[in-house]
Design a protein with these regions (language model features):
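A bilobed periplasmic-binding-protein/Venus flytrap-type ligand-binding module shared by bacterial periplasmic
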Residues: 9-15, 70-95, 99
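Ligand-binding "clamshell"
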Residues: 57-69
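Ligand-site clamp/hinge motif
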Residues: 11-58, 175, 184-186
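Short, well-ordered beta-strand elements
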Residues: 5-7, 22-29, 153-163, 186
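Second-shell loop/turn segments in exported
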Residues: 26, 81-85, 92-95, 126-134, ...
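Structural transition elements
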Residues: 115-147, 164-169
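Periplasmic-binding protein-like
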Residues: 58, 83, 87-124, 169-170
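Immediate post-signal peptide segment of exported/extracytoplasmic ligand-binding proteins
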Residues: 18-23, 90, 138-157
Length: 189
């Protein structure tokens, strides 16, 4: 069963003598953040990723594990389906960008252990271009929606391929932020 995890074993015919150093590795998906941390702290797991941002300080303070906080090549974003009529208008897409307080999102969902994206690739990636942040401006978002013909907002479906705790926080935050400018978000996972 794929949800039980994946076990890979050492290839006895590996081209480099003495490698790999491990006989086997087992990856197990652990959706709930606290469970993943507990498994690492008790030794049930040797590695936990992602380490829940809200628990980084506690794990560091315990001193039982090494916690590396480094720039990431991961980027979280919301993609809009431009084949949907509502998203064909650039003003709607801009409005949604203005409607989300990304600095607050970093604090709420990542306990400050993230950076607001300023381009289509993380700035830690070579040759990434910094496009600059979109400021949080819900009034401008409302004005753009009105100009685009949505003075009362609209309803949209958000699909998420992630169901872990941090993703849930992000989705809830986005629902709240977008609701403030009249956009009702239904979530599908």
């Amino acid at each position: 069963n794929p949800s039980d995890g994946l076990r890979v074993e050492k290839n006895p015919n590996y081209w480099r003598a003495g490698y790999p150093k491990l006989d086997a590795i087992t990856w197990r998906p652990v959706v709930e953040n606290s469970t993943r941390v507990a498994m690492a702290l008790t030794g049930e797991a040797d590695y936990a990723f992602p380490l829940p941002s809200e628990q980084v300080k506690m794990v560091k303070d315990k001193g039982a594990l090494r916690v590396d906080v480094t720039p990431s090549i991961m980027l979280r974003f919301v993609e809009m389906n431009l084949t949907k009529p509502v998203f064909k208008d650039v003003r709607v897409r801009q409005a949604l960008n203005y409607a989300v307080n990304k600095e607050a999102l970093v604090k709420v969902a990542f306990a400050g252990y993230a950076d607001v994206a300023e381009g289509i690739a993380p700035l830690s990636v070579d040759y990434a271009v910094k496009l600059g942040p979109w400021p949080y401006d819900p009034q401008k978002a409302k004005a753009l929606l009105k100009e685009a013909g949505y003075p009362n907002g609209f309803e949209v479906e958000l699909w998420s391929g992630y169901n872990h705790t941090t993703a849930s926080k992000i989705i809830q935050f986005l629902q709240q932020q977008l609701a403030q400018v009249g956009v009702k978000v239904r979530v599908r996972t």
